[in-house]
Each structure stands twice: as structure tokens, then as C-alpha cells.
Amino acid sequence: MPNKFLYTLTFLILFSSINVAGKNDDYIKTSSGSISGYIENKVINYVDIPYAKPPLGSLRWKAPREISNQDQIISSKVGNHCIQEPSSMGGAPGEGILTGNEDCLYLDIKTPNKKLSKLLPVMLWIHGGGNTSGLKDIYDFSTMVNRHDVIVVTINYRLGAFGWFTHPAIQDNHKGIDKTSNFGTLDIIEALRWVNKNIELFGGDPNNITIFGESAGGHNVLSLLVAPQSKGLFHKAISQSGYTTSTSKEHAHINNIDHPTYNHTSNEVTKRLIPDSE
């Protein structure tokens, strides 16, 4: 009997010390679907929420399109980071030449697991990685959420040639904002639009949004400070180890022509990757 009691007591102590992920059955209906969170590290996690239409087919190398699908139930997806080379240095793991998916415009939200008496400040994280690698899941902001009573949003955005690419086969066949080369920047702006529209449902204050990022993410923060499309979508900005350059639009296009991605991609191949209609 003493041994049985000791085993039971030991089991209870060990079990109570393990951080077990729990389910939160309350569904939140957003503009892109309904989602329930799960509790882990003392915060509620809402993961893999689509914030724009998948940039596939006719939407490849175009500005992100607003998503509106309130009737769908959002479920977590495996491998939804944007296409990149596998990397163990702040990027997505994997084997081979490439990992990831073009269908990658998703965001995660972390909120305190407590009853809120007021709307909380919102912080939107932009990951680094040279704008060629990285993903929304690389850091865990649970401690920040718990310690400072904030809501943290992390996002994926298109990388590499899918995110920043100037080519006659693209620009000559597009109009308006679709003619831009800065698709990754526009993804971040679309994520901010989604947050402004939906974050109050999660207890966040749409009038108190801070963008923050490190390295290339810090560079993207600086880009958003001057992008007219982002005006009014955030209120504070933190650039960690960010960098920026000053160049004209014309000179930027000249630099792009010298880039190997441009020189090694023919008009014919690029056009075949862009269907004629949406």
C-alpha cells in the first residue's frame, strides 16, 4: 500500500509540472473563417489563419487579394511557410533544394489566457531572414504576452523571387498595384489590414498596433514607414537591427536587371507561370 501511494503521488507531481496543451472550445468568427484556439505556455494560440487569398496561379506575382470566407472552419496546416531554401539558421527546416508552399499567407495570434477588462495593445512581428527565408513560427512570444499583457501576431509573407521580382513579363502585363515588384511588402500590408479588421474579436485594440521586426524584418518595418498603402494601419514601429538604402525607382530597376534571377529567367518561361485570367 505505501508503495502504491508513493507511485500515485509521484505521478501527480510529474503530471502537474508538465505544460500540457489544452483546447479552447470557443470559436471566433473572423472575415476569413471561424477558429478556436488552444492553450499552451499559459497563452491562447490561434494558428494558421489565412489573411489573404492564396497567391497561386493567376495571383502569382500580384498584390495579395482580400479573403472573405466567414463560413469556413480554419484548421492548422503543416508546412505552410513560404518557399525558401531549407535552413537551420532562422529559416524553415527541410531537405533538398526548396521547402515550403506558395499557399503561405497565414498568421498566428497569441493572447493572454485570462478574462480581459479592456482591449490590449497589439504587436505584429515581421521575421527576418534576408527576405529569402524565415517563417512566422520561428520565435515563441508566449513570455512577452504573459508578462506585458499584449497580443502578438506573427505572419508569413512571400520571400525571394516570389516576394520581390521585377521582370517585363510581369510588369508589362499588369496594371495598378499589380505592377509593383514588392509583393512581400504588400503581403505585410494586407496582414495589417486583416488585423485592423479582426483583432478586436481577440481582445486586441485596433487603435494601438505596433509593428516590429529584426534584420530584414526591421528593414521591412522601415519600408512600411514610407509606404503610402500602410498609412493608418499601425501606430508605432520598432526596427531591430534593420537597414535601409536610399535609391530612386529608376535606379532600383537598373539594379534589378543586373540580378541573376532576372538574367536567368526568360520572358517565355515567366509568362507561362502567369495564367492570363484570375
Please state what every model-predicted region is.
Residues 2-11:
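Sec-dependent signal peptide recognition
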Residues 15-17:
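N-terminal signal peptide c-region/cleavage motif recognized by signal peptidases
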Residues 19-185, 206:
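Non-catalytic accessory segments of hydrolases
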Residues 77-95, 171-180, 208, 219-223, ...:
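Mature extracellular catalytic domain of secreted serine hydrolases
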Residues 104, 177-201, 259-264:
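Alpha/beta-hydrolase active-site loop
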Residues 108-110, 190-199, 221-225, 266-271:
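Short, well-ordered amphipathic alpha-helices
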Residues 131, 213-223:
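Glycine-rich nucleophile elbow surrounding the catalytic serine of serine-hydrolase chemistry
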Residues 202-214:
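Alpha/beta-hydrolase fold nucleophile elbow
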